[in-house]
Amino acid sequence: MDLIVMRFILLIFALVASSLALAESGKTLRCVTTHYPPYTIFDEQKNIFTGSDIELINYLNQSLGLNIKVIHLPWARVKKEMTLNYYDCYFSLATNTLREKHLEFTQHPTHVTKFGLFALDKSTLNNKDFSSTRIAMLRGVALPNEIADKYKILPKNIMHALSTSDSFKLLEKKRVDFIITNYQAGLWFAKNSVGIHARQFNESSLPVYIAFKPGVVDINLIDKQIKQYYEQ
């Protein structure tokens, strides 16, 4: 009898603790991201979000009874906000040592991406030496060593743009020879352009995650639901 009572008490405690750990009842969690198609697409005119990562956020809202409000910020602003503890969470976010000091990351990624190379001259996509070329990249995104070393890409030759859209403008104006960015995102931005060619780098993968301000949610419950979502 004592064992049954003890199990019942532990069950009640676990349920209560889980609900409290997720978020205060009815509290809105403000979650920041940036325009990152096709995973997160922000329509400025309609002020709405679509994309595969948004579908995951909607699933978490429904399955866990959360109220996550998605907020769009430019990437440069997103980087600054991570250390200020003003917002509750961020998504489509890669990990690094600095970010992990301020945020709790899920173990399961929202998606895994690869880098891509974009150019006006298709014949240059398979070059092996980029040491004398001009390359545009999104500011704040690190180029993996596996790619930089193999293709002799030098930091001094990289022009950092404030957005992926700006990178493509630089390419179209021939101010750079190449763009390196997320392959799928680059294809999305290039779809309305004429004469832009692409190839995918297979030397490195980039998983991205949802990250929460410490203490806002039970990160294990979030992880469990993300895993379940992708196993459906």
Mark where each language-model region is.
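Extracytoplasmic small-molecule ligand-binding "clamshell" domains
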Residues: 24-97, 101, 137, 160-161
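Short helices/loops that flank or line small-molecule/ion binding pockets
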Residues: 71-72, 76-88, 164-184, 192
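Acidic, polar ligand-binding/catalytic clefts
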Residues: 69-130, 143, 197-203
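N-terminal signal peptide c-region/cleavage motif recognized by signal peptidases
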Residues: 16-18
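Sec-dependent signal peptide recognition
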Residues: 5-12
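Extended ligand-binding regions for polar small-molecule ligands
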Residues: 54-63, 123-137, 141-142, 209-232
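Ligand-binding cleft/hinge of the Venus flytrap
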Residues: 42, 57-66, 107, 129-132, ...
